[in-house]
Amino acid sequence: GMLTGVKLDGGLYPLSGFDGETIAHGLDSLDEKLQKYSKMGIDFAKWRVAFEINKEKGTPSDAAIEANLRILAQYAKACQKYGIVPIVEPEVVYSGNHTIKQCREITEKILKSLFKELEIFKVDLAGTILKTGMVLAGSENEIQSSSREVARETVEVLKRSVPKELAG
């Protein structure tokens, strides 16, 4: 059969005091949305946060990472309370001139931090899905990653960062 899902984040907005960084909105209405969607029989929900790598600006900042991942963890816990499978999406944005090494370091930092937050909020990882991107150089970098490099770096980051208990 087919499963139904819904996007629950309210979009990305500028993170006050952090030039060029964003934060996801929507926690304020999450509970009532989950009540409604639970009654409708929704199976899963997705929430996206995004991080831009910019070495000159120092992004993503620790503050932006922490704030966004805490929101993802709160969302995931709330979904599970209503029997809805949460899909967590901490996206590292492809645009920019970052190297594959910078992407690897940032992606690994974000994923490790995400799973710490999910643990703090007692999110059941067996009932959670991670939507992640590939580890690769930014679209504006002169040296683009080969498919072999992308595969190797992505798999290594996932092995080092993602607990075995995660569902998907």
Model-derived segments and their meaning:
Residues W47, V88, L130:
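Conserved, mostly hydrophobic/aromatic
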Residues D19-Q35, P60-Y75, K109:
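Glycine-rich anion/phosphate-binding loops
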Residues G17-F18, V49-A63, V92-H98, S139:
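Glycine-rich, proline-tolerant flexible connector loops at the mouths of alpha/beta enzymes
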Residues K122-V123, G133-G168:
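Catalytic-face loop-and-helix region of soluble metabolic enzyme cores
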Residues T4, I65-A76, R104-E119, E149-E156:
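Acidic, His- and aromatic-enriched active-site or binding-groove loops in soluble protein domains
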Residues T59-P60, N97-T107, L136-V150:
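Short glycine/threonine-rich loop-to-helix capping motif typified by GTGT followed
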